[in-house]
Regions:
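Hydrophobic helix-cap positions at the C-terminus of alpha-helices
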Residues: 35, 106-109
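Active-site-proximal region of nucleotide-activated glycan assembly enzymes
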Residues: 108-148
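Internal, well-ordered alpha-helical segments in soluble enzyme and binding-protein domains
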Residues: 98, 102, 144-147
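Glycosyltransferase specificity loop/lid
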Residues: 2-89, 93-96
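Short beta->alpha connector loops
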Residues: 95-98, 121-123
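Short, aromatic/basic amphipathic alpha-helical patches
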Residues: 55-66, 102-106, 129-136
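Short helix/loop capping segments that flank catalytic or ligand/cofactor-binding pockets
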Residues: 23, 99-101, 126
Length: 148
């Protein structure tokens, strides 16, 4: 199992693009709540479709660009416009593409964040060999870790 070091006061930004059937959003929402509740991380869940999110979490106000839901900060993710200091831990839900401006801000940090690409669950044989692999971003040198 790959264990990545994270700071004691960890700020986590989790990005989710809603594709279909709420599966991606459901997994990201559960993961965000788990990280906040069980590991005391300060989690911001960036979601591109708050109307769909409201169907899973009726307390979401789809008209608000930023809101708290329990311990989570929920932010409406609209294209490349991400106005936030990158977290210590950055998770791409299911290979969604992080905004270029956010990646540049990640690279500008004094210490690089832990960057995880959360991938789909699979029982295929190749997955075990890919879990935990890393990839260097060609423009920034940041390292992304793949988590299956």
């Amino acid at each position: 199992m790959l264990l990545l070091p994270v700071p004691a006061q960890t700020i986590c930004h989790l990005f989710c693009t809603v594709i279909d059937n709420y599966g991606d959003l459901g997994v990201c929402w559960r993961l965000a709540r788990h990280l906040a509740d069980e590991h005391a991380l300060a989690v911001t869940l960036w979601v591109d479709d708050l109307v769909s999110f409201q169907r899973l979490a009726p307390d979401i106000d789809s008209a608000q660009s930023s809101q708290m839901l329990g311990k989570l900060c929920i932010r409406h993710w609209q294209g490349d416009a991400v106005d936030a200091t990158p977290g210590d831990l950055v998770i791409e839900g299911f290979a969604c593409s992080l905004p270029a401006s956010y990646i540049r801000a990640m690279a500008a940090r004094s210490s690089a964040p832990v960057w995880i690409n959360l991938e789909y669950l699979s029982a295929e044989a190749w997955v075990e060999g890919c879990h935990g692999l890393s990839s260097v971003h060609p423009g920034t040198g940041l390292i992304k870790h793949f988590w299956f």
